[in-house]
Amino acid sequence: RPVSSYAAAYRKGQGLREHAECHRDHKLLVKVDIHDFFGSISWMQVYQKAFPWYLFPPSVRNLLTNLCCFREALPQGAPTSPAISNLVMASFDESMGAWCEKRQIAYTRYCDDMTFSGEFDPGMVIRKVSAFLEQMGMSLNRKKTGVYTRGSRQEVTGLTVNERVQVPAAYRKKL
């Protein structure tokens, strides 16, 4: 399967609710963001991961990669970038997912937003994510890293996941 089951964005049949559901009613929730996500996906990563040698001859790989990249990176806003980002991130998702499963941590990635939930040391998870991203030439956006306990409002892609998945109370009151 070329796109990881841990990737929740840009996939048919996957929505915000499905993404949020696996993080429902956990003791701890950690959210991290990849800094300059699309701009951090290099021409070479697109060439190797989106257009693999066993499916495309070199000339076709080169042409397709050149069509999908701008200034040696995946451009934000291009219609092809979301699907390609999932192909490039598949090995990351599988490695991160396997690491998390061994520790009974739920993991999903929605574009550049990663969510972890369960009972664990948040620092350990953040360090591991950072190390995995570094191997790919990427880094965390530390300003968007958040740790949320059960006593606080835990949100995943705009949905509250404390006891059940629902839109936040403030939004419901506006309706």
Give short role names for the model-derived ranges.
Residues 155:
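Short acidic/His-enriched helical or mixed secondary-structure segments at domain edges of catalytic enzymes
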Residues 160-164:
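Active-site proximal helix-loop segment of RNase H-like, two-metal nucleases, encompassing DDE(D)
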Residues 1-36:
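Active-site-proximal segment of RNA-dependent polymerases
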Residues 22-111, 115-151, 159, 169-173:
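Conserved polymerase palm-domain catalytic core
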